[in-house]
Amino acid sequence: MSKAPTSTNRTGRKIGQKVKKTKLKASSRRWLERHINDPYVQRAKLEGYRARAAFKLLEINDKHQILKGATRIIDLGAAPGSWSQIASKVTDSTEDDIRVAAIDFLEIDPIPGVKILQLDFLDPTAPDQLMEAVGGTPDLVLSDMAAPTTGHQKTDHIRTMHLCEVAADFAVQVLAEGGHFLAKTFQGGTEKALLDMLKKNFKQVLHIKPASSRSESVEMFLLAKHFKGRRHEPAIDADAEESTED
């Protein structure tokens, strides 16, 4: 299971380091101190992950087993690539048998077993390129996409929710029956139309706040489990569940 990191690391660095006063603004210095002293950042370096976000996925998987049995995975908003690193391992993806496709408009350094597309997911050609890259029907669609923040919470929420909606629509179009969809969202309410669509197409829908998400962050994750398939026009399922986890 994914365990909470300890307060020290093997390099001897201790939590609580201060950043020397330079020309950095106070807010930038506080962010840098928090980043340096973040135990998940330190653990990511020790375990070879590109970002602390790896532990969010691992923590969610510990409880919900969304990676179990996955044979092909698509990672949206993948930079710098920690989720794709995990996906490559669980699918046994190799350069000769690619089973993971990742997309981001930012550059991503190569990851063994991952086909990387440097492209905006909102580009009309992106869905077809992803499906060609992954080489088959995915069991899991991951989205860590978030719009650049403006500092205006309502605007940031609306923009990120749009990305979540586009990702959800893509997942419903491409997932294998029984597959799962996981996407970043922000606190502030998920649009009813999106929740209704997910509950029509998946057996269970949950909001999750992993312990590895910073406590002050408005970030949450929307998990839709057990895709019902595309063989019939979806109807509202009274048994579909929706819940929120801490």
From Swiss-Prot:
It is an enzyme of class 2 (transferase). S-adenosyl-L-methionine binds at residues 81, 83, 104, 120, 144. This is Ribosomal RNA large subunit methyltransferase E. HAMAP family: RNA_methyltr_E (MF_01547). InterPro entries: RNA_methyltr_RlmE, RNA_MeTrfase_FtsJ_dom, rRNA-MeTfrase_E, SAM-dependent_MTases_sf. It is found in: Cytoplasm. Keywords: Cytoplasm, Methyltransferase, rRNA processing, S-adenosyl-L-methionine, Transferase.
